[in-house]
Amino acid sequence: MQRQTDRHLGHYVVPAGRLNWLIPVLPIILSLGGSELQQTGSPVSVMLLSHNEVLPPDADGVILGEVTAKPLTLDDWFKYQKGQPLAVEITGRVEEGSNTSKPDSPAIGSRISRTLQLDPAIRNESICLVDGGWLPLIYCLGGTNIFVDRNIVAEIKARFVGGKLKSGGTAERDFLNMLEQKACGSTLNPLPYALEGNVQNLPDVDVVLDQLRIALADLAHALPHIRVWPKSLYDREQTQATLGSYHAYFNQGMDFLQRVGPSLMATTGKAKRRAAWARIIQAAKDTGISPQHICVAITLSALTASQQFNPAKNVLKPAAVYGAAQAYNAMWDLFLLFLLRQFQSQHSEYRSALLTRDKNLAFLWMGMTIQRTVTEAGEKQQVVFDERLMKCDPDEVEFLQALLGASNIGYERPRA
């Protein structure tokens, strides 16, 4: 059995976790209705094993550890929603204990890749946002630091008790039900729950500690077998340091959104687009906010994306009267993406993810990439948009680059 170690992350400690997969050699279609899966017309058996479990003597398969999955894209989401099977490429290390009768089986210690095909009948109401896109929760059950907010904790509390699905609950197949698996090696991190305020700003230290206490108790009651982080309350000094590191960024975003919120209501035609962009950048300068702040990029997307698909506008919810309450709600959603990206870029070894039920927030994440680059002037942030979130012609791209700096914003066309 592998000894569990503690890893330091900022002021806090995150426990390590690992999940082994027993998989057949060929591609499969994954089903949560039971242990049977469909593979070109013939059933196969797939199991999730914790790192100290052994392969059953009658099982024939390859055990994979250190499993990672290639993130899915916005295009993949649309295919999945249309009922099309979805292929996910996973890579893992062949572990001791693998048992297969096939003569060409991979060697112990080798790394192999396999493609698993998801059954579109499985619901994915809680979307796991990962570095580079999204994944169904099943691919984040081993060693992932999963941020959970108030809505997710409430859903877990309503669905589980004592590590089991509640009797009389929904019988539908949903990836969230996979949290019932005793082999789950990930960590649920309720930091977003603790930091969410209810007074149109980030909460004070006492509120953070109270909310963290509630979240930890609810998770322990619902899923006692799953690791949580932290295991106990932060001390006041640690909590104050965390709040202090986020307050300025959050407040700047709120001030900026209150200034520009009403101007985002109307559809901006192509002829008026450049003037609207220029006003947004001028508002950023007037409020003293960095053009690299996530709010600036998202407001530009809200002005530019089509009204048929505009997740930025749906998250910001512009209105004629856009006060502190509206700005807080929008900034909180964007702050979750900022928090996730900060952990991913500064502590990539913890494979941080955000579990959310907000599809518009998820679409934003799927349709943009927040990259950190190092230049002679220091570290900076670059936002790369999918074309559907910010469709521009070459001249408009040059105009934006003149406003923001050539390295601060870009876009990519959807894959064919």
PLM features: residue spans?
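Intrinsically disordered, low-complexity regions enriched in polar/acidic and amide residues
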Residues: 1-3, 37-38
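Low-complexity, intrinsically disordered or signal/transmembrane-proximal segments
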Residues: 2-4, 8-12
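Catalytic cores of DNA base-excision repair glycosylases
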Residues: 3, 18-20
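Residue-identity detector for glycine
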Residues: 10, 17, 33-34
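Detector for intrinsically disordered, low-structure N-terminal pre-sequences
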Residues: 12-15, 24
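Active-site-proximal, substrate-binding regions of enzyme catalytic domains
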Residues: 21-351, 365-371, 376-416
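Conserved RecA-like ASCE P-loop NTPase motor core of nucleic-acid helicases/translocases
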Residues: 352-356
